[in-house]
């Protein structure tokens, strides 16, 4: 599909200030899509009566590159390049919200990393379809943070799916999908960056297809589906029965995503801030041995070398 077909398509974009939103939005702008608005969750404000939607008109500014390891510019900086309005929302079901968004007259609603459920009265504003970019191979890892669960489950590959928005989260028909390998020890922020780039490419293709009525949705498979919520404390625990390679891969993955794995010897809890490698062998004595260069954590088949801090009594 020629991405040039995306040029001129009226796109209302939903996201938040993160790489998985900024990179696809950058791609839509570069492809020539007509960005008619950017919707983000409103920041918390004091007071009991929050306005359901607030419109801000950004001033036109210079084109900004995406930062390397940072999450890129805030979405309002990208919107300002093409003088697109920003909408901060607290209630997507409010009449005022629907009326304000209806004025943008979108052909396509494009969503990537937006944390709020989008109701049908908003989805229906798009005359050519409403789609979401999800960083997993749906139907596996539905939910708010699939990248964490890729590492928790030890997946050797994942991917990105663009699907139609429906009442059920992450369950709409698939319109585009691509696989991404997950190599041993791949840092989570690198995987996130890969997903953002693939998602951006797929989204531009999907908008181009929607512009000429060429979307070909297919139902998600009925097998292999999973849904995981936000990780809880126990999900961050490294089990002493794990192999050292599994623990190393898990920690390397989730630390750059903002999570801190932990380990317990049954009496004390140790928070892991960095992992430096693995070594074969088993030592006798404490499960955690400290040294001048960090700590050695005994696992099922070897030792995980890490930097740790003691977190108090066993959880």
How would you label these PLM feature ranges?
Residues 273-280, 308-314:
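A short, sequence-level motif marking secondary-structure junctions
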Residues 1-257, 262, 289-306, 310-314:
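One-carbon transfer enzymes
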Residues 276-290:
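A conserved acidic, glycine/proline-rich C-terminal tail/linker
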